[in-house]
Structure formats: C-alpha cells, structure tokens
A protein has these predicted regions:
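A conserved mid-protein helix/loop that constitutes part of the nucleotide-sugar donor-binding site
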Residues: 26-37, 204, 213-228, 333
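A short, histidine- and acid-enriched strand-loop-helix "catalytic/donor-clamping" loop
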Residues: 76-79, 111, 125-142, 157
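Aromatic "clamp/platform" in nucleotide-sugar-dependent glycosyltransferases that forms part
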Residues: 269, 288
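A short, well-ordered alpha-helix in the C-terminal region of glycosyltransferases
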Residues: 341, 348-362, 374
C-alpha cells in the first residue's frame, strides 16, 4: 500500500509538446529533451508530441528507446484505403490517450501558436510554457491578442531564458505576466573548461559561432564592418563556425565581392567547443535576436570574452568593457563601435577572459537540466 501511494504521489507522467516545425531538430529542443531523459532516469514516465519528419532526430529516438511514448503529429496522409479502414491514433487527442499529469510546451520562437494549451486547460492538466527566443521582428496580430493572452495567463509557469525575452513577449501581448521564471539552457562544455590561450604574435583571431543565417545571427553586418579601410589594415581575422541555414552562399560571395578573403574565413561546423577556443581569442556575435545564446555562455566558460549585441541574456551575463563588449544595437555603426573598443583593449583580452569565466560561473547555473527538472515537478504539485 505504501509503495502504491509513493508511485501515485511521486512518480509523474510528464508530457512534452514541441512547437518545432521548421527543421527536424534545433537548439531550442535541447533543454526539454535532456530534462525528459533525466526525469526518465528518476522513474517518471515521459510522453512526447513532436512534428513528423522523414528523418527522426537521434535525440528523440534515444528517449523512445528508453520508454518514452512518442507521437509524431501531422504525418503525410496514408493511401485512400488505409484512411478508410485504419484507426489512426493521430485522430485521437494525444492528451486523452497519454493522460499526462503535467505538460511542458516549448516554443522555439514567440509567435508560435499553442492551441494545445487550451486542450490542457479544458482537461485540468497543469502546463508550463518555455519560450526559447523572442524578438521585435514579428508582432502578434491584434485579432489574436486575446487567444495568446489566454494561453499564457492560464499556464502554471511561463519560462524564459532571459529577462529581455520576457519583456518582448509581454510587449507583444500587452500583458504583464505574474507567473514567470527565468531559466538556463544546458551548455556543451565542461563547467571547469580552461583551454590554452592561443599565441597572438602574428595577430588576433576571433570566432563568430552560429548557424549561417543572416536574419538571426547577423554575419552580413560583420562583412560591412570589416570592409572598412581601418579593419583591412589591422591584424585581425574573423573565422565563421556553423552549419549553413540558408546564407552560406551569400556570405562567401560577399567575402569575395569585397576582397576580404584574408580577414574573413569560413570554417564550417565544429562540435568541439574547447578546440574552437584553443584557436581563437574572443567571440564575436552580432545577433539581431537571441534567447540566451549558448555560444556566449560556452565562450565565457572557456575564459574568452564576447563582443556581442545587447540581445537576449548577453548584458545579464557580462559587464561591458570589463568581461566583454556590448554593442547597443545591430547597426554597422554600433557593432563597429563595440569592436573598436575591444580592439583598443586587445592586449587585455586574456585577463578580461578570466574575469568573464568568473562572472559566468557566478551568474549562470552549473546544472540547468537538474534545475529545470525540479521546476517542472512544481507544476504538478502547484
């Protein structure tokens, strides 16, 4: 009897609903997936609702292999005969079949519609919402204002990865939310990382790490900054790391167009964070919008400064001119101003990087997945 009571009270079935629709997997999915796996290891059940893709992400397969129930929504329609005679479980409501005790809804971008929130509320299932990124580039239409407000107001918790993102969402729906919490995303480097400092006798090299996507990451801005005569004369090289997400061709052509092959170099994706920082003196990130960019957190953990825009969580993590450099906007002029300030202090970058490492360890969780798992348990008990 005591065992049965323990199971009923402490072992919970968590539902994870991802709004990811533009690609089979992305950085916005890492926190909920790792949290789901940790909850599995603690004996909890996990049910996942994810968009169907021809290719199943290995991380999803890993959860399923360890007992998670995986619903792949919106699959291609079956042949006519199968549609007539099959009892497709997709026609049934995921919530009614799985009966989760609590649900986490994850949005990669703030405009994502989440009618699943209404379905949770109607069934009395407590739910939380995690927004991984918000921007001023897209505003929710006024005709849908009350719908969005309802989704967020009825949530037990709304989790943001930065205060800046929370403000952007609240401005979008013209509502001050009282049920919010700032959380951290997991990083992909040791918390005690300390890669060796690269030599600088022949000049300085900085890394621009992020998918090659001008709209979000702003690589095009750096091309315009570096084409100025003063930067052409300086011993500074920018190396681009990241997968192509639509703008690699333009990036390479812009570099060629302006004759910047010596100053701007495309490296491609690297899965070794410490290796990047063994070869680079600083991070450059001219993002137009972000949530809480992991590359900033990982660079600081590796004792490197970041030169970045005042977007997402960046200003919360570093002190401008002391443990990093923050551009007040995303224009060429403002990025140039921040990079110029950094360049004038280039011989202090190593010392400033050590301070950056100290600041990030003081201001950011050393185990975001553990912390988030505990936060989700409170949704069920609240």
């Amino acid at each position: 009897m005591a065992v049965r009571r323990f199971l009923l009270e402490y072992l919970v079935k968590f539902g994870f609903y991802s709004c990811m629709s533009g690609m089979p997997w992305g950085g916005s999915e890492v926190l909920w997936q790792r949290t789901a796996r940790l909850l599995q290891l603690s004996g909890h059940e996990v049910a996942v609702n994810f968009k169907w893709w021809p290719y199943k992400a290995p991380t999803l397969q890993h959860l399923e292999d360890h007992g998670a129930s995986l619903w792949l929504r919106d699959p291609p329609p079956p042949p006519l005969l199968k549609r007539v005679f099959s009892s497709d479980p997709q026609k049934k409501c995921w919530l009614d079949v799985e009966k989760p005790d609590a649900v986490l809804i994850t949005l990669g971008y703030h405009p994502d519609a989440i009618p699943i929130a209404d379905e949770c509320y109607r069934r009395g299932i407590p739910y939380g919402i995690n927004i991984q990124c918000a921007s001023n580039s897209f505003f929710i239409h006024g005709d849908r204002l009350e719908e969005y407000r309802r989704w967020y107001r009825n949530a037990k918790k709304v989790y943001f990865v930065s205060e800046e993102n929370q403000l952007k969402l609240e401005n979008n729906i013209a509502l001050k939310l009282a049920n919010t919490e700032i959380i951290a995303n997991p990083f992909n480097v040791s918390h005690q990382a300390n890669p060796s400092w690269p030599e600088s006798d022949s000049g300085f090299q900085i890394a621009l790490v992020g998918r090659i996507h001008f709209q979000s990451k702003g690589q095009d801005i750096i091309v315009d900054v570096m084409r100025q005569p003063k930067w052409r004369k300086r011993a500074l090289k920018v190396v681009f790391y990241g997968h192509d997400q639509g703008n690699k061709a333009q990036l390479l052509e812009l570099i060629k167009l302006h004759g910047l092959e010596e100053q701007l170099v495309f490296h491609g994706f690297s899965d070794s964070v410490e290796e990047i920082w063994e070869n680079n003196h600083a991070l450059l990130l001219p993002s137009r919008y972000e949530g809480a960019p992991l590359v900033v957190i990982e660079a600081m953990l590796c004792n490197r400064i970041a030169i970045t825009t005042d977007i997402g969580r960046n200003r919360e993590l570093m002190d401008d001119n002391e443990s990093g450099f923050v551009a007040m906007g995303t224009s060429v002029e403002l990025l140039d101003e921040a990079l110029e300030r950094a360049w004038q202090k280039r011989h202090q970058w190593q010392e400033m990087g050590v301070l950056a490492g100290k600041h990030i360890r003081e201001r950011y969780s050393d185990d975001p997945v553990r912390d988030f798992a505990e936060a989700l348990k409170l949704i069920r008990s609240s």
